[in-house]
């Protein structure tokens, strides 16, 4: 974007990012930096809801010239409500990768359609390939 072109406001971006799905975490987001996560697979659904842990991913979306970089991580969302970087068990890899891929395509499409902005993977992002 040129210096004379104004990008979308934080509030317009938040509105469109929220519409993608339940992934945006508003309290952890701020102008120019947006936080997303996805609890893809429950570790043990026999436990009571407040003690459940999940396999999934989280991502920091950071504003750069002309768009955003997406830095993804994978791991476990523990019962304390914190993400822990951890290798996924083989039985959940397909589902976690699917939720990330589906979300990422929606993110790309939304930012391109509404704001003509691009999304690229951060150099330190987890590689879902």
Swiss-Prot record:
<dbReference type="GO" id="GO:0045893">
    <property type="term" value="P:positive regulation of DNA-templated transcription"/>
</dbReference>
<keyword id="KW-0010">Activator</keyword>
<dbReference type="InterPro" id="IPR038208">
    <property type="entry name" value="Tscrpt_reg_Crl_sf"/>
</dbReference>
<dbReference type="GO" id="GO:0005737">
    <property type="term" value="C:cytoplasm"/>
</dbReference>
<comment type="function">
    <text>Binds to the sigma-S subunit of RNA polymerase, activating expression of sigma-S-regulated genes. Stimulates RNA polymerase holoenzyme formation and may bind to several other sigma factors, such as sigma-70 and sigma-32.</text>
</comment>
<protein>
    <recommendedName>
        <fullName>Sigma factor-binding protein Crl</fullName>
    </recommendedName>
</protein>
<keyword id="KW-0963">Cytoplasm</keyword>
<dbReference type="Pfam" id="PF07417">
    <property type="entry name" value="Crl"/>
</dbReference>
<dbReference type="InterPro" id="IPR009986">
    <property type="entry name" value="Tscrpt_reg_Crl"/>
</dbReference>
<keyword id="KW-0805">Transcription regulation</keyword>
<feature type="region of interest" description="Essential for activity">
    <location>
        <begin position="99"/>
        <end position="123"/>
    </location>
</feature>
<keyword id="KW-0804">Transcription</keyword>
<comment type="similarity">
    <text>Belongs to the Crl family.</text>
</comment>
